[in-house]
């Protein structure tokens, strides 16, 4: 009986941790600063993200995040798209939000486009080297529990 109660408690706490992670992930991802670095190809200095330790700790980890699928030219596939903390009219590409509020997504299975908030689960990769890509990349993504 003790083992059953202990197992149930651990299971419930783990579920709470994922929910808390989902709620705070975009907030954590906003903990960045920038430094200027010379880009050889462009011939001038560009802003490069400097990730906080909290963000670095998430590198390569499976995370769950809620947000909106952004229809962006060049990301037409249902397995490759941009994901935003905010709806399309408020996201980074339409003004107002910063680059830390969007991520590139590569999914395992095609994910149907929706204008509603959806939840994704995948492995987070950080990008501070390639200025032609977003700073956050979610790979092996799939719809998370409680997704709409």
In which residue ranges do the predicted regions lie?
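Sec-dependent N-terminal signal peptides
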Residues: 3-14
């Amino acid at each position: 009986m003790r083992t059953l109660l202990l197992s149930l408690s651990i299971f419930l706490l783990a579920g709470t941790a994922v929910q808390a992670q989902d709620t705070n992930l975009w907030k954590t991802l906003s903990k960045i600063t920038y430094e200027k670095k010379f880009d050889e190809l462009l011939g001038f200095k560009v802003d490069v993200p400097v990730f906080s330790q909290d963000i670095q700790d998430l590198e390569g980890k499976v995370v769950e995040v809620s947000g909106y699928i952004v229809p962006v030219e060049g990301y037409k596939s249902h397995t490759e798209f941009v994901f935003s903390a905010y709806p399309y009219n408020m996201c980074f590409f339409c003004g107002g939000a910063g680059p830390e509020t969007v991520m590139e997504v590569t999914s395992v299975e095609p994910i149907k486009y929706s204008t509603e908030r959806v939840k994704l689960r995948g492995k987070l990769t950080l990008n501070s080297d390639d200025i032609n890509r977003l700073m956050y990349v979610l790979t092996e993504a799939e719809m998370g529990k409680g997704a709409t």
